């Protein structure tokens, strides 16, 4: 496969995938929660992820043609598949049972702490991927994704501090 190089468009596609995985994770967690407060919080977190996906879609539309860099040589789409696999495994794993992380009846603070950890994982993921996006293919745009994730942590932390 050789060394992996990504463009900003591919990273935005994966950012949206992570948000969709988050929606599925929190929706499933809501179904499994025994108490109403926990269910409500999971639904709110899923809704936040949906808004985030829309933000990334909007940001992606503003990418330049170079940031789409469709001329990268990757006939089997190996690089993008690698990127998707990493996102699925290390941020929100769509196959993971939320109850392995969240116990039924978990208090809202514990639930929010788990959500904050997921957001931190996404920041680490994007910071690592940024090194594989050449500047001409939009590496600086990855900072915009990280900024959005940091903003999400701030919102979740404020929410947690209120409970």
Where are these regions (language model features)?
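Non-heme di-metal
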Residues: 1-163
């Amino acid at each position: 496969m050789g060394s992996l190089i990504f463009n900003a468009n591919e990273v935005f596609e994966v950012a949206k995938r992570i948000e969709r995985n988050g929606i599925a994770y929190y929706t499933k967690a809501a179904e499994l929660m025994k108490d109403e407060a926990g269910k409500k919080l999971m639904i709110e977190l899923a809704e936040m992820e949906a808004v985030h996906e829309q933000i990334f879609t909007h940001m992606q539309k503003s990418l330049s043609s170079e940031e789409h860099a469709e001329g990268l040589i990757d006939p089997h789409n190996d690089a993008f598949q690698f990127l998707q696999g990493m996102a699925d495994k290390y941020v929100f794993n769509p196959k993971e049972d939320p109850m392995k992380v969240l116990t039924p009846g978990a208090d809202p603070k514990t639930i929010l702490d788990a959500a904050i950890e997921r957001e931190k994982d996404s920041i680490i993921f994007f910071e690592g991927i940024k090194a594989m996006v050449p500047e001409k293919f939009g590496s600086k745009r990855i900072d915009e994704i990280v900024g959005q994730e940091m903003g999400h942590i701030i919102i979740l932390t404020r929410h947690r501090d209120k409970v």
